[in-house]
Amino acid sequence: QIDYDEVGYASWYGADLGGELTANGERFRPQAMSAAHRTLPLPSYVEVSRLDTGRTILVRINDRGPADPDRLIDLSTGAAEALGIAQSGMAQVRVRRVNPVEAEKIALRAGQAAPLRPDMPEGLLEILRERVARLAV
């Protein structure tokens, strides 16, 4: 069941927070494929897609945030690196809640990456870029 599909801005956090407790009560692992979101249930699984490249990753929501009200999601360091935004610090993204297969859930709970997702097609990226352009930043 997909009940959340939004566009906005992603940033990343946590390089210095290793071992701290997340809102889910788990120890934060900066290199894990995890993220913080304000409202999605803990845990939730989302595909995060960059709107400039189409690159898509699967992450597990296990924390609350981002602190910045203009951000939709805060990625762990590992997720930011996988999405290719660790250097720039921020990117326009689509965040879509998904229900992955059990093997992917197990991998993410263990701090490992799930198999790569296909890149988003250019036609869909154009539509989503128009949606995010209407957001006030």
Language-model features: where?
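Secreted/periplasmic proteins
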Residues: 1-137
